[in-house]
């Protein structure tokens, strides 16, 4: 059976698409093609027209939604997640899962994480607030910053390697894509401020588009 995979938030840019765009895409896919929708950054989306994927499962039995405990839940070391869909679609997807890939400890951690929704919301709200602050300050400096709905921001730069080297020399570690840009993970307010103070002194601060 054929499969198509989509990411709700593009990595490394963090940009997303609307509910209507998702429906248009699903309508264009044959019903015998399995569609897996990666929602790893689902909890960081604050757009009003974000894709409401779970509402579509009854209308699109070939759709499976994938989510992880590695991002918002903070369980990256456990490598645990889940998927939701029709019985047939989940059965087909299960055939690709490596046997015994999740430990008992990871399962216990995931179950416990599901019981602390208030803490999850507080944590993600804090990251979103910092994401908006970092984005605003970078743009005020003159950097181009894409509209991210994830826990990171993307700065497109033709001089990415030069900027990567500049930051590393000042002990600031980011994810670099030479010739394309840099992806900066939103951390604590103190760490974000340190990053902003360092990048503010970057000699070629004006973006090269």
Annotate each PLM feature.
Residues 1-2, 27, 55, 202:
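Short amphipathic alpha-helix with an adjacent loop that forms part of the alpha/beta core around
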Residues 3-8:
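Short, small-residue-biased leader/transition segments that mark boundaries at the very start
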Residues 12-35, 39-70:
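Active-site pre-lysine segment of PLP-dependent enzymes
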Residues 20, 161, 166-170, 175-209:
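PLP-dependent enzyme catalytic core of the Aspartate aminotransferase-like
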Residues 37, 65, 102, 174-176:
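Hydrophobic residues in well-ordered beta-strands that form the structural core
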Residues 62-139, 143-146:
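PLP-dependent aminotransferase class I/II
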Residues 127-128, 132, 136-170, 186:
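Conserved PLP-binding catalytic core of the aspartate aminotransferase-like
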């Amino acid at each position: 059976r054929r499969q198509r995979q989509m990411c709700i938030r593009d990595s490394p840019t963090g940009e997303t698409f609307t509910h209507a765009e998702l429906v248009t895409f699903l309508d264009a896919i044959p019903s015998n093609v399995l569609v897996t929708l990666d929602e790893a950054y689902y909890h960081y989306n604050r757009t009003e027209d974000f894709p409401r994927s779970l509402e579509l499962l009854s209308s699109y039995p070939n759709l499976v939604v994938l989510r992880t405990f590695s991002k918002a839940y903070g369980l990256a070391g456990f490598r645990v997640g889940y998927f939701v869909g029709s019985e047939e679609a989940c059965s087909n997807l299960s055939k690709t899962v490596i046997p015994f890939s999740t430990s008992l400890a990871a399962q216990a951690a995931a179950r416990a994480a599901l019981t602390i929704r208030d803490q999850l919301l507080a944590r993600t709200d804090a990251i979103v607030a910092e994401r908006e602050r970092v984005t605003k300050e970078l743009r005020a400096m003159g950097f181009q910053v894409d509209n991210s709905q994830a826990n990171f921001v993307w700065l497109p730069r033709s001089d990415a390697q030069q900027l990567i080297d500049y930051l590393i020399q000042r002990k600031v570690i980011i994810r670099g894509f030479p010739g394309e840009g840099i992806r900066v993970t939103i951390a604590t307010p103190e760490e974000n401020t340190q990053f902003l103070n360092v990048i503010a002194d970057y000699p070629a601060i004006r973006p090269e588009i």
